[in-house]
From Swiss-Prot:
Pfam families: Ribonuclease_P (PF00825). One of its GO terms (biological process) is tRNA 5'-leader removal. Belongs to the RnpA family. It comes from Borrelia garinii subsp. bavariensis (strain ATCC BAA-2496 / DSM 23469 / PBi). InterPro entries: Ribosomal_Su5_D2-typ_SF, Ribsml_uS5_D2-typ_fold_subgr, RNase_P. Keywords: Endonuclease, Hydrolase, Nuclease, RNA-binding, tRNA processing. It is an enzyme of class 3 (hydrolase). This is Ribonuclease P protein component. One of its GO terms (molecular function) is ribonuclease P activity.
Length: 111
């Protein structure tokens, strides 16, 4: 099976998701999730950060954790193709891999 790119990269598609997509806010985690159905056969993910999120090492670690948790939970989205954008907006988050994985598992079931 060919490895698919699960990253969302097109600027036009990202703007469309921000405008037309559904929004879920998590005030206790300072996290927002936008999602919208796509016409592809697979789901895609984008993790972005607000301007207040400092430190490239921490940003890249959080991004890697989200992508890995999403990749492992991709089978829950079988038959549904959605584009998901996570906006992380606070620097002092205590995000562990297991917390992110349980968050994504619950969110995927809501989508």
């Amino acid at each position: 099976m060919k490895k698919r790119n699960i990253s969302l990269k097109s600027k036009i598609e990202i703007q469309k998701i921000f405008k037309e997509g559904n929004l879920i806010r998590f005030s206790n985690l300072n996290l927002k999730m936008f999602f919208k159905s796509n016409n592809l056969i697979y789901s895609r993910l984008l993790v972005t950060f607000s301007k207040g999120f400092r430190g490239s090492v921490k940003r890249n670690r959080v991004r890697r954790l989200f992508k890995e948790a999403f990749r492992k939970r991709l089978e829950l989205l079988e038959g549904r193709a959605v584009d998901i954008i996570f906006v992380v907006s606070y620097n002092r988050l205590n995000l562990t891999y297991f917390r992110i994985e349980s968050l994504i598992k619950n969110l995927v079931l809501m989508v």
